[in-house]
């Protein structure tokens, strides 16, 4: 049902895009808009992951440079029946994470140093399981298409204002009114559709992520910490590129301006409540988390030995053990 709803919303955005093209240039403008939409999505399909990772200066790591973090992702990917994704670290104090890639065979997951420093290993596992759920559900591709179309609709809405619409279809005042409505309504409508798609997929990824890591309370605890951290610690790169906000597990925008007027994510308390209900239905009453170890020295990095012995000697067990 979620995939059907998502497909319908993307189709709606495509119709909106073509409609603005029609206002600008009649039938020819509509076809040009369609060609532009297809071209932009093809470019995004092949290059969006590289672009966003470069945007956040993400550093790829492996089993030698980040053993615990890498093995954790490897174990979770095995639990989910997924190919091993590329694993990245973003040097950013705000705790957060995202996944990208056009399909499970070409996927990447990234976590900030703030997340790896501030969360327990179990909470990190819950977060990375959520990101792998996005990969498994192919949400990374869906959201790339939605974001591309939303940006294109906004761009064409502005063009409609400056160009004054198609003269053949303008017919005086009605043409002017139609152009103004396209300029104002289309970007907001695209934003609302983007929000609807993102919110639907977040709930699905929470549920599947909890199944992958085995304990919904790990993810619910992590969401609370990340939400508090996102409010307290600005993510400057995300503030400069708000179009990427929907990719993160929690909205990274601090709301210093009007960034949070329309949220790309469901309410965090509602997500936590859903996960707690899921845990109760599974008969899980406790997250079973060991106390978070002190952050390692800068030389080893916050991901080098977070939580103790990677073989499980610190007393906790999880999919990374």
From Swiss-Prot:
Q: Report the enzyme's class at the first EC level.
A: hydrolase
Residues annotated as the enzyme's active site: 131
The identity of this protein, by name, is Protease HtpX homolog
Residue stretches in coiled coil: none
Region feature Disordered, mapped onto this chain? 287-321
Q: Where in the cell is it found?
A: Cell inner membrane
The organism named in the record is Brucella anthropi (strain ATCC 49188 / DSM 6882 / CCUG 24695 / JCM 21032 / LMG 3331 / NBRC 15819 / NCTC 12168 / Alc 37) (Ochrobactrum anthropi)
- Enzyme Commission code(s) on record: 3.4.24.-
Keywords for the protein's UniProt record, in alphabetical order: Cell inner membrane, Cell membrane, Hydrolase, Membrane, Metal-binding, Metalloprotease, Protease, Transmembrane, Transmembrane helix, Zinc
Q: PANTHER family under this entry?
A: PROTEASE HTPX
Q: How is the cofactor bound?
A: Binds 1 zinc ion per subunit.
**Gene encoding this chain?**
htpX
Transmembrane feature ranges: 7-24, 29-46, 145-165, 173-193
């Amino acid at each position: 049902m979620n995939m059907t709803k998502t497909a319908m919303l993307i189709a709606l955005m495509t119709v909106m895009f073509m409609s603005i093209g029609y206002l600008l240039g009649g039938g020819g403008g509509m076809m040009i808009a369609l060609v532009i939409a297809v071209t932009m999505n093809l470019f995004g399909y092949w290059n969006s992951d590289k672009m966003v990772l470069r945007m956040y200066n993400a550093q790829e790591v492996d089993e030698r440079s980040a053993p615990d973090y890498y093995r954790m992702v490897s174990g979770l990917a095995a639990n989910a029946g997924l190919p091993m994704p590329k694993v990245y670290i973003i040097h950013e104090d705000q705790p957060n994470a995202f996944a990208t890639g056009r399909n499970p065979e070409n996927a990447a997951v990234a976590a900030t140093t703030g997340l790896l420093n501030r969360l327990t290993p179990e909470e990190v596992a819950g977060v990375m399981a959520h990101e792998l759920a996005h990969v498994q559900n192919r949400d990374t591709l869906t959201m790339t298409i939605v974001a591309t179309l939303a940006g294109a609709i906004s761009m064409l809405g502005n063009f409609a204002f400056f160009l004054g619409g198609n003269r053949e279809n303008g017919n005086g005042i009605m043409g002017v009114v139609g152009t103004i409505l396209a300029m104002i309504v289309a970007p907001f409508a695209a934003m609302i559709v983007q929000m609807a798609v993102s919110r639907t997929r977040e709930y699905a990824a929470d549920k599947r992520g909890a199944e992958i890591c085995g304990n919904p309370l790990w993810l619910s605890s992590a969401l609370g910490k990340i939400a508090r951290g996102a409010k307290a610690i600005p993510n400057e790169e995300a503030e400069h590129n708000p179009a990427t906000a929907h990719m993160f597990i929690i909205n990274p925008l601090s709301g210093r301006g009007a960034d949070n007027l329309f949220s790309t994510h469901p309410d965090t308390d509602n997500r936590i409540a859903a996960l707690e209900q899921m845990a109760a239905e599974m008969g899980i009453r406790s997250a079973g988390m060991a106390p978070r170890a002190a952050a390692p020295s800068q030389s080893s990095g916050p991901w080098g030995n977070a939580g103790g012995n990677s073989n499980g000697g610190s007393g906790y067990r999880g999919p990374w053990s």
